[in-house]
Amino acid sequence: MRQGRARFITGFLFAPVLLYVVYVLVPYGQAFYFSLTDTTGFSPEHNFVGFTNYLELFSDEVYLRAIGHNVVILTLFPIFTILIALFFAFMLNIGGRGDKAGIRGVRGSSVYKFVFFFPQVLSIAIVAVIWRRVYQGNEGGMLNAILIELGLVDREKPLAFLGETDSVIGKLTFGEFLLDAPVALICLIIVAIWGSVGFYLVLFSAAMQSIPKDIFEAATLDGANRVQTFFRVTLPLLREHVSIAWVYLGIAALDFYALVVGLTPGVGGPNHATEVMSSWMLTNSFRPDRFDAFAYACAMGVSIAIITLLLAAVQLRITRSREKLEF
């Protein structure tokens, strides 16, 4: 009986594991191997150069700046997305008026969830078209038009949101490492938050609906207000869901390639204002001025994979609950 069950499980696992090995692990192995060579990506002939490409990453000013941009995204994007999603999920599920029937959500909450979730079903290309119209650097842009009508911006000098290279936090240097947050990069983060809040709102909302209403009613009877109920009751019970969301958003923050290409002029924006690790990797893949550009890009790809794995491990370690709360 056990042998038959083992064969059954093995048979079902064989195909997906084989596909994972062929299409995920093997390409990673090839990328690591090519990163140790001077391959052009087009010729089978190449020489072994060791970790030369990896050492060069530490002197690549654009790549180091791109890492800084990913750090800014990693700091702002997950935090604001989770906070906004948690706030609206709480208000939609427990933000209604309490009555004899107990704690209720906001009337028409399903409609609000649909509205919030709608950006999630749009492709990145459509999102880019919409927000390029919003950020357009003349009075025809939606945001500029509003600011001009309010008298906050001169009609003759509209703001070029996606072309602004000035940093909102100045420029912080740590040796060769540069940390800055150009206005154009902040604009991309806002777009990413807008597109992601809906999904996590639905995720947190579903988790809140699984919490018995008796718990919230008991907190209300004990004199807890909505703020105390959220921080002392709701949030601890959603700890695992927030941890998962944090990991997914952290991984997404290390990518951002589609938004960079879709929204900013050129790959990486003006003066590399929106350059991220993935966009600089793609730019270096087929540089005509460097014969081993493909090998150098492979080194970037491997470094991004390592950073992503370390980040996911650290986030899971930090946010993992030591004891599981049950209800």
Model-based region annotation:
Residues 2-327:
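A structural signal for multi-pass alpha-helical bundles of membrane permease subunits
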